[in-house]
Amino acid sequence: PAGSTPDNVYKEQAGFEALVNSAYAFWGGQFYGREDFVLLLNGGGDLWINIANCGYGRQMSKYEELTASVGQIKNTWNRLYEIINDCNAGLERIDQVEFKDKKLRDIRFGELSFMRAYAYWHLVEIYGNVDLRTKETSAESLSMNCYRSSYEDLYDLMLTDAQNAVDNLPVDPYPVKDVGRATSKAAYGLLARIALTRVSYCDSQADKDKYYKIAEDAAQYVIDNQSALKVSLYNTPAEVFDPDNNKTNKEAMFVVTHSTESSLNMQAKNPNRMHMYFHASYSARAGMVQDYEYGNDKNAKSGSMAMMPTRYLLELYNENIDARYNAWFREEYKLNTPKAYAWTKDQLDYFEKPSSMIGQVIQPGETALLFTKKKIADKRNLPYAVVDIDDTYAADGSVSKSANFNIHFPTLLKYEDANFENKGLPTNSQVGANDVITMRLPEMYFIVAECEIMKSGGNKEIAKARINDIRRRAAVPGKEAEMEVGVDKMTIDFILEERAREYCGEFMRWFDLKRTGKLVEYVKAHNPDIPLIQPHHAWRPIPQMFLDSILNPDEFGQNEGYN
């Protein structure tokens, strides 16, 4: 209304609620569900590479031409600071709000504290020691001098905020239908994650041990209080990412929500596109057509926004005993047309099969395509098309230069979306509605294990027990004993292997490699298609737009390697 000011609007409970809700909006509207974070956080590491090793988003995923002027670098910076600014505005005003329900004040205080810590964790890990802002800012106030803050000060604020979230957030969201709100389990998880990351900025072992204790205590609390916190592991890997469990996922500790009602999303016709970003090309091959079961492979071509697993990632799994691989990756496509398919010369040539197979028939429901991590003998003479690991990748792990084979690979299934079929939308629709799980319970087990491995006087038997808790859940039925590992495996490198098997594609890998100081080592060892990797890539550049807007850009400075 005319004459309204933020102070007047936010003093009313309805206005304040709108401010709190706005702090959530960008997580789905800009980050978790969109391509930038896929490129920034799944890309740039050892587990994923652009489909066909193409150049889409190469600045983020392969560090090619990564400069301070790249749009995604600017947008990520701006949106994270906007979230922080909303949180600062709310935290500054919360005690002036006329709440009808007094307990709501503490809950919203916890949510704003959680959101600010979560945003700063992303911001600091992506860009380094940036400007610490705890007061609401305007464009005018930022057109002045800005100064870098120390990692100590930045992490002190994050840890304080995370602890405030722990102290104030309820077990259930408030109101209970708002499943995307931060709750107690999310607060403990964030405290554990932030404290573990804080270790990487410590000089002495004694200082590291201080933060290992905070991280382990928070993670172990979640493990010990699953019933009270309303979180638990599914019995099998297949259940974790079953689309039927997406909106009520019992293993999720924090989710970024996307509504099945398009108009409720920040970008109504463009909400969650994750279902498009990990598919291999299958339609129009060997008689296959695009359908709901196998998903939208529109992006599965060179030059598009899609990611394929590295050879290293695929070879981390022993699918004979580890059920995660077949639960979370698709290799086989069965003919999905009502009529049989007869092989044609052009399709035989495409898959390098003998012309003598012209006219041979694949019946509906029979295997038409197999894109596999295995090596298949006599693969060209099988009645269906085979692209095996040696077709898709070279021996050194790089992506094949064959345009016929480098768009065919095992497809990640963690983001399959039932919204299209449920709504009767076309199979090539982009409008996904899945929630994106950004924190899952197994992370707490890995944090406890890592702390016991790395802290002074740690107990590797405890680490082994926590890792085996997750590996037993991951086992093929009857293979639980074979999946268990011994104390000799309790190293940081094994933790990173196990995190890769459990969390591939879930936006964690770049953070994990950076936190452990392994980014350059692992990329050089396992992803030869990122030859430009350098130590300074553990930070992205400070946006030129920001430096141009302040009075002391030289004093603030660009991150090393980007001048």
Give names to the regions the model predicted.
Residues E331-I470:
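C-terminal substrate/ligand-recognition segments
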Residues P1-N53, Q163, K185-Y188, R193-L382:
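An aromatic- and glycine-enriched ligand-binding surface/loop that stacks and positions planar moieties
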Residues H122-D131, P173, I194-A206, M454-G457:
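Short coil/turn linking the two alpha-helices of tandem helical-hairpin repeats
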Residues T67, L80-I83, L157-L159, V240-R311, ...:
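Long, intrinsically disordered, low-complexity segments
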Residues E12-Q13, E17-Q30, A52-Y127, S143-L157, ...:
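Conserved, well-structured interaction surfaces
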Residues D86, L154, D161, Y211-I214, ...:
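Alpha-helical solenoid repeat scaffolds, predominantly canonical TPR units
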